[in-house]
């Protein structure tokens, strides 16, 4: 086992491990980090690191649920413009769907709810990275769609 490793080494190794997209549990990450010489690592610290770096659980190529750091994710900071968190805006005849960076949907939905009916939004439902927008009227869904797109400077 190696002598004490620096916090920078831990972060670098942690990110490298997550890029492998093969660890489905925090205990597996703990074991991998311990095998790399970080003897003082535990599940609690791994949990905090996963949160700090914006890790998400997703399916890998083998359809296994694993932790990863998606490239497009850039963890939002206090100075991040909200428009950077909106990845896609689409619609059908009755609903508008907004896809966001993981973890940003509820924040964006709250903003959309606050502008509400005057802008054609009856309400929203948000998950982790997807928002369903119910327009005030399906007859004006195109106008509501344009309002949402302009709010986030989104262009097709």
UniProtKB/Swiss-Prot annotation:
One GO BP annotation of this record: L-arginine biosynthetic process
GO terms for cellular component: cytoplasm
Keyword presence, Iron: no
Recorded metabolic or biological pathway in which this protein acts: Amino-acid biosynthesis; L-arginine biosynthesis [regulation]
Protein origin, superkingdom: Bacteria
Pfam families: Arg_repressor, Arg_repressor_C
Broad class of where this protein is predominantly found: cytoplasm
UniProt KW ATP-binding keyword: no
Subcellular location: Cytoplasm
Keywords: Amino-acid biosynthesis, Arginine biosynthesis, Cytoplasm, DNA-binding, Repressor, Transcription, Transcription regulation
Regions that span the bilayer: none
SUPFAM superfamilies hit by this protein: C-terminal domain of arginine repressor, Winged helix' DNA-binding domain
HAMAP family: Arg_repressor (MF_00173)
NCBIfam families assigned to the protein according to its UniProt record, in alphabetical order: argR_whole, PRK05066.1
Name of this chain's protein: Arginine repressor
High-level lineage: Bacteria, Pseudomonadati, Pseudomonadota, Gammaproteobacteria, Alteromonadales
